[in-house]
Amino acid sequence: MAKIAINGFGRIGRLALRRILEVPGLEVVAINDLTDAKMLAHLFKYDSSQGRFNGEIEVKEGAFVVNGKEVKVFAEADPEKLPWGDLGIDVVLECTGFFTKKEKAEAHVRAGAKKVVISAPAGNDLKTIVFNVNNEDLDGTETVISGASCTTNCLAPMAKVLNDKFGIEKGFMTTIHAFTNDQNTLDGPHRKGDLRRARAAAVSIIPNSTGAAKAISQVIPDLAGKLDGNAQRVPVPTGSITELVSVLKKKVTVEEINAAMKEAADESFGYTEDPIVSADVVGINYGSLFDATLTKIVDVNGSQLVKTAAWYDNEMSYTSQLVRTLAYFAKIAK
């Protein structure tokens, strides 16, 4: 049984606990977050986007009791001071968003943990993993890895199929993305000085940047320099879609594209021909759900523009992939 600690009990940290409770061989034994434990337990139990937690949680001195099992709760700002060695922590799931550099994340290792998985994009000095795309790049000797971003986890399986089967010359991706807590609920100064994210999240379509297209090269090196992209934040709390417009090396048909995607489907990469909307993907465990009804091809002067699209729950889809990576990393650890 691998012992897991979660550092940062926000949107991803709380959903990670839900998922880990369903995964044999993993046990969350500790959580670290600076927020009051009573508040954390309430936010874990009641979730506006993902629904109520079906199990039981109660707060006691210095701990939660989740489905009858005690989970220690700490409120320590410096990860290096956490008792990971005493608790025998195998892997820390780093979900604060603050310790995304290798040196900073290694504070958990210095505190006694064996491994760290960062729930965010990280630097080029770390392996960036999208499960069922490049997790076999891991050999178990790594101490810190990145689970990439929610959008990279959506884009990578679709891009891999296109590149493996037909070859990608170049492409541009757009994620139509739910709003997140780095936006304002009402107009006001943004903490990072972003004039667009300073505007009310639930009122407008808000253009934003995304690193997913460039980060894809950390997952699929053959795509380095071939993709770019942007994001459009829209007024829904979760449920997003990524569109990829590509120029391929081979002439293709819609049927060939869809057949290739269907053949590649697995636990991480779903396939649907249903006319779904974003509300239908809230809570799914696929990291990416390919929508065959949205595949389009335009022939232009002997060349083709190929548009493909995949849905994802930017919260639960990503968390499910993150936990798969976590479980695999714990299993192969050396």
Swiss-Prot record:
What is any one GO biological process for this UniProt entry?
glucose metabolic process
Query: What about temperature dependence?
Result: Optimum temperature is 10 degrees Celsius. Above 65 degrees Celsius no activity is detected.
Q: Where is the active site?
A: 150 (nucleophile)
Query: Where is this chain primarily localised?
Result: cytoplasm
Q: Where in the cell is it found?
A: Cytoplasm
First-level EC class? oxidoreductase
Query: Which residues are noted in the entry as D-glyceraldehyde 3-phosphate-binding?
Result: 149-151, 180, 197, 210-211, 233
Q: Tell me the CDD domains matching this sequence.
A: GAPDH_I_C, GAPDH_I_N
Q: Which pathway does it take part in?
A: Carbohydrate degradation; glycolysis; pyruvate from D-glyceraldehyde 3-phosphate: step 1/5
Q: This protein is called what? A: Glyceraldehyde-3-phosphate dehydrogenase
